[in-house]
Structure formats: C-alpha cells, structure tokens
C-alpha cells in the first residue's frame, strides 16, 4: 500500500543515533527501560485486578493509565530497538500509518486519563463528603470513554492528514518511529494545512488536559495549605510534587515537540524530546503511582502472601 498519489511503499527509520559505538549500549539501555515498563505496568494492572479494596475511582483510572503505558511503549520501543541492531530499519507504509495511529491514540488518551486522575484527587481532597456522588461509576465510565474517544478522534485526524500527503523519492524518516512532524518533512507537496491541523489538534489534546491538571493540583495545594497539619502538608506536598513532575515531563515534552512550527525545532532535538513522553514517562508512572502508595504496597504484600502460602 502507498500513500495517495505517492510512489513510496515503505519508509526507513533513521533511529536515534548515527554513531556505531553507541548502538549496542543504547540497545541495552532502552531494552532495560522497556522491561521495567512492561513489568511495572503489567504488575500494577494485576495487583489492581486481584485486590478488591483497590476497586475505587482512583485505581480504576490508574489501571487504565498502566494499560495505556504498556500498549504505548509496546507500539514504539520494539521497532526502536531494531534500529540499534539492524543496518536498515525498514517499515512498510501500512505499518508506519498503523504505528502512527496507535501512537496518537495512546498519547492523547493518556493526556485525558491524567486529567481525570487529577480531577479525582481534587474531589477526594477538596470535597470529600461529595466524593462518592461526584465520582460515581457512571461518571468514571463517562470520563474514561471521553478519554478514549478523544484519543480515537485525534488519531484519526493526524493519520488521515498524513495519508493524504504525497511522498516522492525520499523515504528516510529522521526519527526512531513514525511520528507526525518527520513525515510532514518528507512530503513533496505543501504541508502548511497539515501543520495547521497538527497545531490545532495538539493544542486541544494537550491544552485541555494541562488546564484541568494544573487547576486541580493548584486547588489541592491551596486546600492543603489552609487545612492540613505540618506533617500532613509535608506528605501531601511530597506526593503532589512527584505527580506534577511526571505530568510536566509528559505534557512539557509533547508541547515542546508539537506546538512550534516545523522550521523552528530541529528534528534532532525533537527526537530527544520524544524520549520523555514515549520512554521515560511510561517507566516512571508505575513507580510514582505505586511505590509511593501505601495501598498498593499493602496489596502487593497480601498478593505475595497468598501466593507463598497457597
């Protein structure tokens, strides 16, 4: 399959580095990241599924965040690892569009899941008496469907705009994956309208969750400052700060990559920026949201205890 009015049937992914001496060390480094991502997120999914006391709105969203991170990483990392060990990392046009679609779907869905999690924490801390009513099963399901719906819409918009481009002789993608901006650069017709579509869709898909997340955490911190003891403040600040760091990495690197004109941001810098939301954040999420979480630690001990004594 080729693009509309295009002679290109496959692409070559350039990868992360041109230096042969770095390929093997980087292969093992990112293989390690991928292993931690898979084990951490699948472990968290299993724990939440097996322990009924974790069947609450917070862990409902965390379950889906871990599922997205696992799928997201699996969409990107295996093909990226191939670029370190093969001379020419070829991907078919269909394979490239499929990777692009799922990349967009998971990254947009994660944006809205993170905003739903921030809203859940806001209600739990600032309006605890209304929590069970505000975060009912129906509301949680609607928020989840909204997140996946926005992910699907964003993926269709981006993939559709790329498939309508014309690709000529050049098929070398200056990236370790099929991403929007490197593919726009390969187009041999004007990509102005496509860049405009990217900017508008990303502004919505990043802007709405960012506003929700940071307003929620600002209200949480304000409530903590006014109502908590010194010890409670310290614990809450520690938890909120770690969450905000991960969220800032995810949204900040995405905004840095996509909310600038193609001519301003060199793609070499874009590749490095992409590492944060494609590799680093899926590794950090299960660590931040589980190892610092008392309920998850208790669930882990109970689960391991049942396995040992069964």
Curated annotation (Swiss-Prot):
GO terms for biological process: G protein-coupled receptor signaling pathway; sensory perception of smell. Its main location: membrane. Residues 46-53, 120-138, 217-236, 292-310 are cytoplasmic. Coiled coil: none annotated. Keywords: Cell membrane, Disulfide bond, G-protein coupled receptor, Glycoprotein, Membrane, Olfaction, Receptor, Sensory transduction, Transducer, Transmembrane, Transmembrane helix. InterPro entries: GPCR_Rhodpsn, GPCR_Rhodpsn_7TM, Olfact_rcpt. One of its GO terms (cellular component) is plasma membrane. It is a multi-pass membrane protein. Odorant receptor. This is Olfactory receptor 8B12.
């Amino acid at each position: 399959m080729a693009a509309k009015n295009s002679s290109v049937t496959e692409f070559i992914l350039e990868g992360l580095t041109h230096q042969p001496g770095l390929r093997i060390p980087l292969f093992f480094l990112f293989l390690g990241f991928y292993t931690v991502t898979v084990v951490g997120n699948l472990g968290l999914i299993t724990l939440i599924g097996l322990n009924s006391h974790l069947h609450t709105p917070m862990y409902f969203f965390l379950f889906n965040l871990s599922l997205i991170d696992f799928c997201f990483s699996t969409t990107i990392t295996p093909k990226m690892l191939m670029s370190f060990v093969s001379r020419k990392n070829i991907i078919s046009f269909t394979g490239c569009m499929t990777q692009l679609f799922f990349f967009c779907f998971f990254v947009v869905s994660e944006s809205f899941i993170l905003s739903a999690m921030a809203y859940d924490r806001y209600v739990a801390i600032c309006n605890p008496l209304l929590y069970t009513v505000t975060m009912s099963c129906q509301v949680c399901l609607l928020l989840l469907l909204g997140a996946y719906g926005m992910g699907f819409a964003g993926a269709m918009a981006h993939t559709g705009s790329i498939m309508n481009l014309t690709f000529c002789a050049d098929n070398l993608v200056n990236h370790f994956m099929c991403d929007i901006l490197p593919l726009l650069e390969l187009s041999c017709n004007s990509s102005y309208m496509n860049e405009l579509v990217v900017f508008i869709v990303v502004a919505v898909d990043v802007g709405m969750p960012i506003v929700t997340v940071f307003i929620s955490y600002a209200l949480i911190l304000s409530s903590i400052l006014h109502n908590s003891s010194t010890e409670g403040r310290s614990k809450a600040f520690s938890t909120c700060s770690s969450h905000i760091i991960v969220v800032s990495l995810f949204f900040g690197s995405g905004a840095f990559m996509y909310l600038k004109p193609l001519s301003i941001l060199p793609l070499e810098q874009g590749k490095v920026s992409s590492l944060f939301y494609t590799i680093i954040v899926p590794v950090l999420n299960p660590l931040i949201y589980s190892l610092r979480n008392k309920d998850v630690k208790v669930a882990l001990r109970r689960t391991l205890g049942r396995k040992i004594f069964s």
